[in-house]
Amino acid sequence: MAKDLTNYRNFGIFAHVDAGKTTTTERILKLTGKIHKIGEVHEGAATTDFMEQEQERGITIQSAATSCFWKDHQLNIIDTPGHVDFTIEVYRSLKVLDGGVGVFCGSGGVEPQSETNWRYANDSKVARIIYVNKLDRTGADFYKVVKQVKDVLAAEPLVMVLPIGIENDFVGVVDLLTRKAWVWDDSGDPTKYEIKDVPENMTDDVEKYREMLVETAIEQDDEVMEKYLEGEEPDLDTLKRCIRKGTKDLVFFPTYCGSSFKNKGVQLVLDAVVDFLPNPTEIKPQPEIDLEGNETGKFAYVDPEKPLRALAFKIMDDKYGALTFTRIYSGTLSKGDTVLNTFTGKTERIGRLVEMHADSREEIESAQAGDIVAIVGMKNVQTGHTLCDPKEPATLEPMVFPDPVISIAVAAKDKGSVEKLGMALSKMVQEDPSFRVETDAESNETIIKGMGELHLDIKVDILKRTYGVDVEVGKPQVAYRESITKRLEDSYTHKKQSGGSGQFAKIDYMIEPGEVGTGFDFQSKVTGGNVPREFWPAVQKGFETSFEKGMLAGYPCVDMKFTLMDGAFHPVDSSAIAFEIAAKAAYRQSFSKAAPQLLEPIMKVDVFTPDDHVGDVIGDLNRRRGMIKSQDSAATGSRIKADVPLSEMFGYIGDLRTMTSGRGQFSMEFSHYAPCPANVAEVVIKEAKERQEAKSK
């Protein structure tokens, strides 16, 4: 029997590291009856933080999917990490969600990572509720955070509750819709609360904010607005309908507050998820694409009767085996079904289906459009692959992941672990598309690449803890790039005569800087038959293969354009291989003449510091060759945004803590590539040459 999809809510909880997402999820699970004893993050016992690395560090690394129920609605919750090195997890979960709860710290306000996550959610057009947490904290200020949401995120918070008391005196909230006060006792039991009349000293504020709430909400319905202007107050159901519409259309974001740790305020957030976040049928259907990645004009409609369309959005290995977390967009998926993976072109049989609750699971017979489930034991699937009905194949828009910016060499400490290391790394690549593994062709070293220092630290930790492989770790290496700055026309002739048939190929070509972001670009302007068309791909291949390695320090090249202008061939001695060799030699001949330059990755750095350390932090960023972009006051200090070369940011977290007595925070994400200053390029090139020499000995 088909489930009622209007009673589904697929949503994520996301925020800055330490804003209290995991604690909030724990409280939700307690209230919805999924767990009996609440696990505390600071004790390393939280239900959704189930990797050892997460429990030790107190940060959530993998998005754990959890299903629970509230007021006859099924909630599928994704708990996402807040640390910038794991932003990929946030992006990946937003891709498959219909709504979100953005958690902000009552004292920290809109912190760096909150901004990144908010931007991703805007890009994915995900409706959100705001929850200002930790109002029991010293320095907490609900109204200041609301103002920051407006100023920093350029978003419209719709205040739904007002706090009763603050810091140690925080006891509950006033629900503006009902004009009732929810007051919790200090027993630590979230169900021990009373609903009372509004405290006398708050009535004026309550009326003022309620009027603002009503006037903002009714703008969603002209008819209701007209009646209101004529003096008719909208009833509760009408108001909720208007708020739901505005939330769904991203016009505003219903804003709540509380203290998850003290078990105060979470029920109203759950009510808001049910009342205001969209169900799967209210979301724009996923477009289907062809093999070239172009939209076909068809859509995966949320309907259990339609052909199966599902997206694998996360692969995980746990103690039960390989899990493929899947969002079903249309159709129904049952045990025993055969599905087609459109990326590999292979079919697989579905052995077992499970509904996840953090790291425990419940076996189910089938799932349908709107569900988020895990498939056990799939072999050839990766994140972003589409699973569909083999009789009616279609591909959903895949996920796009950024290139890594940092790499380190790893080697097994003993020979017996070499094979184990290879198997472990291939599983880890399947699980995390922003993590890459390569083998250096010359040194045969295994190189792992990722999004930041912490990202790779955690991977090394996982190798040791989860797979039992001890590794030696090299020094972090920056992913430099090479390019040229000058346009050059040149010619090269490849001749080889050694008895029998020889080799001959002549090419006249132009090499020039390309537009930023174009990568490798090749075209032929040959007219007539001087270079027959059949040899053009060989010329392209020769240039493209060479392009993978620059001549300055051996780093990959970016943004270069190659044009085949003319040339000559011999009817007997010319071949595709001769033209490929000519192009490779031409590249080596011309690269150094075209004013090559080394490019370095520049990171967008966002630092929070208490005001009395601002001078030290700015001075330090300047010493790191940083360019300060802005400085603004935050809730409890200052926000400094800067562009800083990645090579200067190693170990920054330790230095920042020292400078700010442990109170500074920062986030960092890749921004762009920029030319290296000559003195820096000189050192990088020298070190690269020394490494090459050491490898060839």
UniProtKB/Swiss-Prot annotation:
Q: Where is the tr-type G domain?
A: 6-281
Offer a single GO CC term for the protein. Answer: cytoplasm
Disulfide bonding pattern of the chain: none
Supply the Gene3D superfamilies for this chain.
Answer: 3.30.230.10, 3.30.70.240, Elongation Factor G (Translational Gtpase), domain 3, P-loop containing nucleotide triphosphate hydrolases, Translation factors
Q: Which Pfam families match?
A: EFG_C (PF00679), EFG_III (PF14492), EFG_IV (PF03764), GTP_EFTU (PF00009), GTP_EFTU_D2 (PF03144)
Top-level division of the source organism's lineage: Bacteria
Q: Does the keyword Protein biosynthesis apply?
A: yes
Gene Ontology MF: a single term = translation elongation factor activity
Q: Which CDD domains match?
A: EF-G, EFG_III, EFG_mtEFG1_IV, EFG_mtEFG_C, EFG_mtEFG_II
Q: Locate the residues binding GTP.
A: 15-22, 79-83, 133-136
Q: Which compartment or compartments is the protein found in?
A: Cytoplasm
In the record, biological process GO terms are: ribosome disassembly
For this UniProt entry, what is the primary localization, expressed as one broad class? cytoplasm
SUPFAM superfamilies, per this entry? EF-G C-terminal domain-like (SSF54980), P-loop containing nucleoside triphosphate hydrolases (SSF52540), Ribosomal protein S5 domain 2-like (SSF54211), Translation proteins (SSF50447)
Q: What does this protein do?
A: Catalyzes the GTP-dependent ribosomal translocation step during translation elongation. During this step, the ribosome changes from the pre-translocational (PRE) to the post-translocational (POST) state as the newly formed A-site-bound peptidyl-tRNA and P-site-bound deacylated tRNA move to the P and E sites, respectively. Catalyzes the coordinated movement of the two tRNA molecules, the mRNA and conformational changes in the ribosome.
PANTHER family (alphabetical): ELONGATION FACTOR G 1 (PTHR43261:SF5), TRANSLATION ELONGATION FACTOR G-RELATED (PTHR43261)
Family assignment from sequence similarity: Belongs to the TRAFAC class translation factor GTPase superfamily. Classic translation factor GTPase family. EF-G/EF-2 subfamily.
Protein name in UniProt: Elongation factor G 2
The protein's organism comes out as Trichodesmium erythraeum (strain IMS101)
**Lineage per the UniProt record:** Bacteria, Bacillati, Cyanobacteriota, Cyanophyceae, Oscillatoriophycideae
- Name of encoding gene: fusA2
